[in-house]
Amino acid sequence: MSKHIGAQMLEFTQNGDERGYLVVLEGMQDVPFDIKRIFYIYGSDSTVVRGQHANRRTKFVLINVAGQCKVKVKDGKGNEAVFVLNRPHTGIYLPEMMWKDMYDFSEDSVLLCLASEHYDSAEYIRDYAQYEKEVNQ
């Protein structure tokens, strides 16, 4: 597991044989929070940028279960890192208050997103200047 500015790459156990592979994810075991929401992103063109926000309370684990994409994370203090998600048994953990941009999606990309909280639009910060202000207060 590598860690960058609060984001962490996670590697999940693969169980496999001649029939293929199985990856099991359980909240508070393989994922560092109870999973309250699951969604996935697919059909995004390679020029599309998704995300472009931070969450005040929600933590995420992002896993590209098919294809690949890149995730750029920023901490609002001048630090950033780029992760390539291209293996279905790896993911990235994003704590709350982490700015995220997902981009460079392959045609077959399916990005699975596990969230620690139910959806609440009020906890999203969609303006980067506002995000920096909140992080640095």
Map each language-model feature to its residues.
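Non-catalytic, conserved peripheral segments adjacent to functional cores
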Residues: 1-90, 107-108, 113-114, 119-137
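Well-ordered alpha/beta subsegment
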Residues: 87-91, 97-104
